[in-house]
Amino acid sequence: MKIISEGETKLMVPEESTLSKKDTVFYNPVMETNRDISVSVVQSFLDDFKRDEFLMCDPLGGSGARGIRYAKELKFNGDLKVSIGDINPSAVKMIKENLKLNELENVEVFHEDANVLLSKNFKVFNVVDLDPFGSPVPYLDSGIRASLTKGGLLCMTATDTAVLCGAYRKTCIRKYNAVPLKGDKELAVRLMIGYAVKMASKYDIGLKPIFSHVTDHYARTFMVTERGAGKADSAIENLGYIRQDSEQKSFKTFEEGSEKGYAGPFYLGEISDKNIVQNALNTAKTRNYSKRAVNILEMISRESEINQVGCFDIHELCSFIKKLVPPVNDIMENLKENGFKVTRVHYNPYGLKTDAELSDLVVLISEYHSKKY
């Protein structure tokens, strides 16, 4: 074992990890960025929380890194309590050692299956964070029911992004009851949100995303639970289908239904709230969290200003129109000069989010080549 630091927290973790299910206790150092962002986003949510008690649950605790960082680093004037669970007795032992290391008394540890722990706590938690190895689907129903407090927060990670991005089409249809679409990683998190919205609606619960990102091997989202059939109906109205021809996306609403050539359903509404993102960014900067976490938050802050589903991949677009790829910064400058909003996206170095149409981009790239060459 070794002791490392993440944020303001000390953690005892395995000396070596294969980052697979073979590990006795799972700890992934690559996910420090994920945890930095998670603490920042939940802190932003917590800043507007009006009750005296704030109850959180990390039912898939592993080494306890996520839940313990929440317990140690979240600032709250009231009573903040965290429940951490794991089915693995070795993990439970390590979580308890990490609690001693950080001198925390506001955490309760459970040696229990995640679904059992969540089911025993129906409508109890203000925040449930599902961070599994693979898909969150097996835990989603229990997670929704455990976070049905008024204005609760459901956070979830999916590491099966190859499935969500369309590499395993049949698996996606089977697991997420949706047809995936290849090419744009943002659609992975939108598909995951869409599935969660459908699951929650049967309980007359609407889910409203306040922060989402796709980084490395995972997709992650944070969704506020809003009670009432009307809220569930409003959330469903944000679902729809997408057809992509070359770089052009076409959309159909959920009620219109899908037809041949369309994928989905995807969540087509806003997936990140501007104020939440900005407050999370301020938190990450103030606490000197990892530079990478700050960079991702900065990029998503700019993305949240532009209402576009996905992005335009400049390399793919230029390949389609048979043009050499101009410098991305030059394309951005030309778009701005023509009155369009534009920003790079956090998940694709060649991706641009803009309010320009595909035809506008084609014209600008063609004009760039005619002037340059």
Curated annotation (Swiss-Prot):
Its EC number is 2.1.1.216. S-adenosyl-L-methionine binds at R35, R66, D86, D113, A114. One of its GO terms (molecular function) is tRNA binding. GO terms for biological process: tRNA N2-guanine methylation. HAMAP family: tRNA_dimethyltr_TRM1. NCBIfam families: TRM1. This is tRNA (guanine(26)-N(2))-dimethyltransferase.
